[in-house]
């Protein structure tokens, strides 16, 4: 806190800088509401020490981070805004005239879109003896080891799975077959991380 106070005082002494507030970010995709209570306590402590040094921020930006359900989006299409805002109303100690800012972009629009893509190819890897290869013709003793669906969208369209293995639900919009098979869904980009 002492470093922050010194930095703010330096900013306030500069003629072309106007200090207006603090910004706190505790992470992304947070689903445990108790984390926001802890954040409020930290901010309250920060505001107390700032006030002791005659610094009263006009703006308190609490960041975002409110998670959405990527595993079952149809069951939870809207983030839990009610409990989220109730925590700040109850636990954040701000003064009249101070404004509280929230950054809830993903929480608001994250469930509102879909990436629609089409299958370009289906590729099957076979094990024939001790040799693994991709074949278009099968041999009686060959067994499928892995099946790939190559689609026309790639990591350039949806980078989250490539960056940090984020999960997104994949739905086949055209098949009416009740038979389920396991495939690795991959894009056309020549990178090993171009997977969904």
PLM feature segments, named:
Residues 1-5, 29-41, 76-83, 106-112, ...:
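Active-site glycine- and acidic-residue-rich loops that bind
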Residues 87, 96-196:
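Charged (often Lys/Glu-rich) extended helix/loop segments that serve as interaction or gating elements
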């Amino acid at each position: 806190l002492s470093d922050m106070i010194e930095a703010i005082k330096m900013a306030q002494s500069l003629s072309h800088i106007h200090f207006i507030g603090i910004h706190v970010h505790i992470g992304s995709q947070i689903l445990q509401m108790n984390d926001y209570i802890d954040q409020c306590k930290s901010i309250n402590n920060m505001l107390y020490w700032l006030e002791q040094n005659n610094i009263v921020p006009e703006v308190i930006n609490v960041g975002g981070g409110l998670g959405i359900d990527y595993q079952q989006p149809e069951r939870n299409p809207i983030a839990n805004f009610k409990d989220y805002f109730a925590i700040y109303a109850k636990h954040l100690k701000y003064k009249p005239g101070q404004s509280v800012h929230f950054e809830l972009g993903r929480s608001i629009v994250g469930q509102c879109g879909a990436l629609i893509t089409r299958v370009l190819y289906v590729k099957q890897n076979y094990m024939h003896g001790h040799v693994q290869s991709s074949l278009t013709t099968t041999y009686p003793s060959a067994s499928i080891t892995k099946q790939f669906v190559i689609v026309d969208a790639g990591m350039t369209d949806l980078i989250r799975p490539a960056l940090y293995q984020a999960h997104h639900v994949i739905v086949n919009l055209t098949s009416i077959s009740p038979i389920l098979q396991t495939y690795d869904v991959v894009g056309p980009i020549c990178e090993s991380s171009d997977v969904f």
